[in-house]
Amino acid sequence: MDRFIIRGGRRLTGEIEIGGAKNSGLKLMVAGLLTSERLVLSNVPAIADIKTMRDLLVGLGITVEDAGPRTLSIGGEIGSVEAPYDIVSKMRASILVLGPLLARAREAKVSLPGGCAIGTRPVDMHLKGLETLGAEIRLENGYINATAPDGLKGDRIILPFASVGATENLLMAATLAKGRTHIVNAAREPEISDLVHCLNAMGAQITGEGSGTLVIDGVEKLHGAHYAVMPDRIECGTYACAAGITGGDLLLVGGRADDLGAVIRTLEETGVEVLEEERGLRVRRSGTLQGVDIMTEPYPGFPTDMQAQFMAMLSVAEGASMITETIFENRFMHVPELNRMGARVNVHGRSAIIRGVPKLSGAPVMATDLRASFSLILAGLAAEGETQLSRIYHLDRGYEGVDRKLAACGADIARVSD
């Protein structure tokens, strides 16, 4: 099993290219289920979750071909409607094949999902929304069995929470439903807009992205398209924290300020400067990090996927900070590992109090989920001495070439195999 060895204390300078968004690329691949024609996606990140989604689509009878560097061609007839446990258990996003299978094949059998061990992440909203569109759903032996023998029918769906996954599943299902569908309290994340733009390029009729209410006029069929996956705003924010925690100066090539409003505002409150340039975002820090209070919220609020990275940075900031997690349960699993490195973090329910310390110390630590993995890398970059990070397969799910990108900017980091 691979691990990272990090020797901290080096200031990062240089350029890092931001790849395609994991949280968009996965959903755009699933959109390929909605047509027999070819959906050609470019700027697809080379990460483990993309490979898992590829395996899932192939298992459903869809052909997925390499069509160039970071480019996939997806399409074909659906040969199976079962998404099995051995694949779905690896990745939470697998649940998103449910809506497209129902819309196009009128039936689906999808294992209840796995993925990161972050709270319960219930799928109730997905299922209730699909039932509103006319699906019949039964939960049996760990599987979701869904049918819509007469096809899905447009209706009004009000989500009790602006769930990203439920919005995406219902949005894709509604593109082939009969009539008009309203999704009220829809998620507003940039990745939702990316999915809307891709679906519209395939012939869907969707309006309202970013407004909180999506309006979908169903069509009989979708066609193929060429589409580029948006840059990964979470990867961009993560490397911005790397510049912040090391007092560095990084140009994040391809980074877009429009996707990172709350993150940029919070970085600036801590004393990290973010400048828009022609090729991306320049992030640098010359002064002292300052403590701030953060509350995670649905977009356009502060993203839960950036919480762990900011905690690492705030652990060496002046003063006290508080992070309140409102999206997921159990998303402070990185706290004991940070504390092993000398951080002073106490968890009280959904809030974590961080009292900044002058320095962290290298230690053996273990990753617990995707974003927590990178928070420990950040801590290792700032720590005195050597940090060994194990279970980095979590990291490989969502970040491409971490050691290569960081080393090119001056980090002392190496991947080793046991």
Swiss-Prot record:
Localization in the cell: Cytoplasm
MF terms (GO), sorted A to Z: UDP-N-acetylglucosamine 1-carboxyvinyltransferase activity
Positions bound to phosphoenolpyruvate: 22-23
Catalysed conversion reaction: phosphoenolpyruvate + UDP-N-acetyl-alpha-D-glucosamine = UDP-N-acetyl-3-O-(1-carboxyvinyl)-alpha-D-glucosamine + phosphate
Record EC number: 2.5.1.7
Residues that, per the record, bind UDP-N-acetyl-alpha-D-glucosamine: 92, 305, 327
Protein's GO biological process: cell division; cell wall organization; peptidoglycan biosynthetic process; regulation of cell shape; UDP-N-acetylgalactosamine biosynthetic process
Active site as annotated: 116 (proton donor)
Coiled coil location: none
Matches recorded under NCBIfam families: murA, PRK09369.1
Function of the molecule: Cell wall formation. Adds enolpyruvyl to UDP-N-acetylglucosamine.
Family: Belongs to the EPSP synthase family. MurA subfamily.
Name the record gives this protein: UDP-N-acetylglucosamine 1-carboxyvinyltransferase
Species the sequence originates in: Gluconobacter oxydans (strain 621H)
